[in-house]
């Protein structure tokens, strides 16, 4: 697993590329290979399985359900998918993300950084191999942004997760193993 940052000006195609990799958008030509499989050829069921098992998404907006506590928000993809919850893994994930003391708190009782860590936990609850992060620090202050980068680095190094992150902040991008720059829809 690698930690890759994709950078470029607004409107350059960064988020579009991430959405194509994650199968949220469909390309008009070519192929998109993730983990050796051409996702452009997936049936609807295969794409659904791909989203549930292989890919975790972290967005700029936390998208947490306000009536669910930290743990319930993290296990939500498993609950919705009818998948069993590996409580030992979820406990380890909550501990790793520094949320053990906040496990029973609702999103409104958490700081922005804590909410983003919950969304990272939710993205990883299914044991996804690839984490796609679209401006994950866009709503956070600089110190909290660097804390989130530290979690990403640790996820990559300790757990071997592949992380593809969109950012406009070159300082944050420097935390990645590789930096890809996009200008006008082209990798430069």
Give short role names for the model-derived ranges.
Residues 184-188:
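Conserved switch/coupling elements of ABC/ABC-like ATPase nucleotide-binding domains
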């Amino acid at each position: 697993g690698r930690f890759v940052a994709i950078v470029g000006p607004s409107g350059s195609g960064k988020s579009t590329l991430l959405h194509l990799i994650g199968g949220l958008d469909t390309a008009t030509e070519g192929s998109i290979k993730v983990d050796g499989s051409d996702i452009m050829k997936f049936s609807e069921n295969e794409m659904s399985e791909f989203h549930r098992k292989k890919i975790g998404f972290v967005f700029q907006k936390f998208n947490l359900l306000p009536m669910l506590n930290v743990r319930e928000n993290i296990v939500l993809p498993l609950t919705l998918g009818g998948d069993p919850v590996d409580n030992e893994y979820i406990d380890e994930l909550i501990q790793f993300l520094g949320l053990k003391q906040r496990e029973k708190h609702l999103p409104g009782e958490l700081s922005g950084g804590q909410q983003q860590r919950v969304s990272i936990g939710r993205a990883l609850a299914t044991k996804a191999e690839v984490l796609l992060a679209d401006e994950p620090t866009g709503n956070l202050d600089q110190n909290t942004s660097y804390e989130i980068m530290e979690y990403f680095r640790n996820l990559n190094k300790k757990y071997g997760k592949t992380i593809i992150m969109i950012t406009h902040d070159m300082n944050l991008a420097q935390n990645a193993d590789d930096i890809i720059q996009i200008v006008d829809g082209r990798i430069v």
